[in-house]
């Protein structure tokens, strides 16, 4: 199954579970200066807005960034960040609580590329295998990353090498996530 289909289904499962548990779509703190096409409804009394993932039109691409960094991104990374706008997805895998990072709007996509650039350059400076982060964990300094040379999705402490493989690739990672 493609990354696009896996991601679409993951967003749907996350939305369905949230609706079942809260009678609302997933919530995000509303920021008038940071609007998203995935926002639905009105801001609630706590300052939150409901959201539902929507297709990016046109689709985002990391190809120019890959060329600028002189790297090849693993298959599926473009789809993971360039297919949909949405909030982050809370899930678990292999006993770890993770937050899959997603793109909220076109400005967020630009910011993501800046963050990826900084991360790759940091890995080069440390002479470590290059990775791209795709998620967070309950531990502040533990990231979910994709190894560029293999495509494996791994856990990585900030500034350290990856130390635990979660999935062989992005597609298998998305399939294994439980919401």
Curated annotation (Swiss-Prot):
Localization in the cell: Cell inner membrane
Gene3D superfamilies: Syd protein
Keywords, ordered alphabetically: Cell inner membrane, Cell membrane, Membrane
Primary localization class, coarse: membrane
Pfam families hit by this protein: Syd
Domain of life: Bacteria
Xref: InterPro entries: Syd (IPR009948), Syd_sf (IPR038228)
Its job: Interacts with the SecY protein in vivo. May bind preferentially to an uncomplexed state of SecY, thus functioning either as a chelating agent for excess SecY in the cell or as a regulatory factor that negatively controls the translocase function.
NCBIfam families: PRK04968.1
Similarity remark: Belongs to the Syd family.
Name the UniProt record assigns to this protein: Protein Syd
Species of provenance: Pseudoalteromonas translucida (strain TAC 125)
Gene name of the record: syd
């Amino acid at each position: 199954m493609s990354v696009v289909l896996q991601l679409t289904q993951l967003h749907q499962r996350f939305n369905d579970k949230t609706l079942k548990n809260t009678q609302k779509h997933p919530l995000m703190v509303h920021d008038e200066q940071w609007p998203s096409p995935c926002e639905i409804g009105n801001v609630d009394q706590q300052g939150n807005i409901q959201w539902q993932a929507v297709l990016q039109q046109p689709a985002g691409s990391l190809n120019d960034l890959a060329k600028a960094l002189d790297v090849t991104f693993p298959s599926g990374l473009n789809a993971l960040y360039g297919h949909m706008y949405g909030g982050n997805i809370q899930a678990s895998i292999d006993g770890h609580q993770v937050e899959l990072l997603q793109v909220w709007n076109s400005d967020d996509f630009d910011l993501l590329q800046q963050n990826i650039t900084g991360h790759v350059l940091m890995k080069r400076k440390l002479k470590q295998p290059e990775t791209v982060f795709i998620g967070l964990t309950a531990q502040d300094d533990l990231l979910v990353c994709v190894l560029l040379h293999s495509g494996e999705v791994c856990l990585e402490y900030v500034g350290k090498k990856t130390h635990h493989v979660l999935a062989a690739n992005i597609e298998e990672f998305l399939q294994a996530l439980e919401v």
